[in-house]
Amino acid sequence: RVFIGSPGGLEEERRSFKQLLDRYSIVHAGPHDVMFHPVGWEDTTAGVGRPQELINEDLKQCDYAVFVLHDRWGSPTGPTYSSGTEEEFALAEELYRAAKIYNIALFFKDVDKSKRNDPGPQLKAVLEFKRRIEDEKRYLFRQYVHSADFTDALEVHLASWLRDHHKTARGSSMLDPVAETASPISGAGPSPTV
């Protein structure tokens, strides 16, 4: 299961995300008994509770998380976070540290120079977040211009995640704490549906 988090304005990327995961599962992953299942807020079942918490519960069931930002930050979800995407990203980091999620991929869509010269509060929040990510040096993110660039970069991630799954299936993986190439994440590896 692969979660996508993004504020509004990135509907094309969200659509591309779901289409790519479905196509990649059929063409590349399915023959290896692996399915990449897309998960987003659109898939969250309506119910009683704080809406963002219901979305968070879906994120907690995922193996990977993908975040995409452009010129909007989103709306506050409560007193702690200034947007749903920020809350989802914080939760994904917590899940990663607890070895409950295997990886986080972060993408930034390029912003026109004219907008960067006079950013409103939404874009300012995105730029501050990006600056923090750059300063902390904990993520190698991808910047892209067109939706097709995002899809191409995401496909590379899927190929990498599929390779990791194969290594896990053979008993030697970055996800295996006893493997020579151990990473900060430990566990038995992703489920056949990732």
Which functions belong to the PLM regions below?
Residues 12, 75-78, 115-117, 152:
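Extracytoplasmic/secreted cell-surface and envelope-processing proteins
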Residues 94-112:
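A short helix->loop->beta-strand "cap" motif at the edges of active sites that frequently abuts
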Residues 110-193:
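C-terminal interaction surface of TIR/SEFIR-family domains
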Residues 1-68, 98-102, 179-194:
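Conserved N-terminal substructure of TIR/SEFIR domains
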Residues 67-71, 108-111:
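Short loop/turn segments at strand-loop or loop-helix junctions that form parts
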